[in-house]
Amino acid sequence: MPPKKKGKRGPSAKTKEKETVRVASEGVTEQTKDFYTVQIRDLEKRLERYQSKWDEICAKEQLKEAQYEQLSNDKKEIVSFLKRTLNQRMDEIADLNDQLLGLQQAKDAEKDAYESQLTQVRHELQDTKERLTSENMLLAGKLASLEEFRVQKEELMGKFAALEEKVKEQEQEHKEAMYILEKKVVLDKDRLKKEMVQRVSTVAAEFRRVSNNQMAETTKRAIRENVSISLQLDKMSDKSIELISENDLLKDRNSELTKQLEMLEENEKELVKNNLSNQKVIRMLTDKCQQQQEILTLLEHTQHALNELQSQHHNLKDESQQLKQKLVSLEDDLQRVTQEKEGLSRQLEEEKQRTLAVDMILSQAAAFLKDMLLTHSEDETEGMQLERRNKMLQQLQLLLDSSATLGLGSSLHEFETKQGHSLKSLKTNRQPVSPVLKGPGVTAHYRIGDLGLVPRQDVSNAVLSKTAMLSKITRLGPLRGTHGISKELLSWTQEEKQIKHSALPEISPGAPSKLLMAK
């Protein structure tokens, strides 16, 4: 209820004012009730659209925030995973670098040791080779001389064997000759003895026979024969002595050749021992050379493994570079998503500002309507009330124009060509204005069918400017051909009440309709 002013007024004045207010209310109700109702419905529909748009924007914002949070979490997880992987790769690279450095140092140390050892072995091998070459040459010379000696030995052994055979044959012949000679000597002695005995006996007989005749001649002849036999025996004895001395010489020669053969056999044994020792040294050097060859093969395998480690190191470096590039691309994607989020945040802020502007416009429109419908002063005259109401409607029009300027509604000129036929029906259904409205100072501004809400352009545009604030959706279809507005059109649905209550908390949902119905 509007506040009452102090002071007492007469019953005639009160009755006159009530009649004036009733007439003005009837005039306002007949001419503006449908306009206010359609405008309120249009504002409610706009509010519903803005509320649905706001809900969509909030849902999109929540979706975008969820997507942004998901992207942020994914980015954080990806970045953490990539950082962890990068750190892992860097640790592996560091470990591989350490291993590579250790292997390189160990390889260098082993290489230096092996090179020094190989150099030393090469020097030793060269010295041994030279020494063995010289010894081999000496041994070759000795072997050649030994071969010559062997040939000579074989020749000498052949000669010695031939000589032994010859000596044996000569010994055998000598023995046989000695035996024959001894036998012959014995036989000759026996024969000579026999002959001598016989001859002695013969000589004795003949001596006895001739002794008597020629004793002296027989004795001389026997003595001469005895002397010749003694000379033959002496010759045979000298021949035997010569054979014995020759046999002794052959035995001495045989003993000397045997001694030389023993010396040559000892030299041959020494040469065989030296040859065996040289073969052992050559075998040892061959084994050592094989060991050095195995060491070189191991070094080659180590070098190959080192090259593989270096290739793995390069591959890990390339993979780390790729991971860094991927991280940079992910950071770029994150920056792009952040920029998109900032753009969406700016759009959201703009939508919030637009929503706030719409809420402010709606609240101001509701406040103006509330002031227009609820404000009632007993001191004001009918012309002042109509003028105040006209100003409020002009302010509402300015609010709607400002909302159209902001892009939140339709402009005034969009309704001029589309809603002209609807406004004609409104003109026919309106009652003529009460004569009370034709007071001084008002007749130039207000006319029949014109509330003066918009500065008058011409007679045809005066009525169109009143409904220019309606949206394109509202076409005044339900109001055609009707003189009054039913209670069903002025009543609020439950959904409109909820939207009205959520958007305009200062105005009760049923206040405008109740006030209009009361008037």
Swiss-Prot record:
The record's subcellular location field reads: Cytoplasm, Cytoskeleton, Cilium basal body
SS bond list: none
- Ranges of biased composition (kind: Basic residues): 1-11
Q: Kindly list the GO CC terms recorded for this protein.
A: ciliary basal body; cytoplasm
- Ranges where the record places region Disordered: 1-25
> What GO molecular functions are on record for this protein?
microtubule binding
Keyword list, A-Z? Cell projection, Cilium, Coiled coil, Cytoplasm, Cytoskeleton
Q: Which residues form a coiled coil?
A: 28-185, 241-356
Name a single GO biological process.
sperm axoneme assembly
- By its UniProt entry, which PANTHER family does this protein fall under? CILIA- AND FLAGELLA-ASSOCIATED PROTEIN 157 (PTHR31954:SF1)
Q: What does this protein do?
A: Specifically required during spermatogenesis for flagellum morphogenesis and sperm motility.
Concerning its family, UniProt says: Belongs to the CFAP157 family.
Q: What protein does this entry describe?
A: Cilia- and flagella-associated protein 157
Please tell me the species this chain comes from.
Answer: Xenopus tropicalis
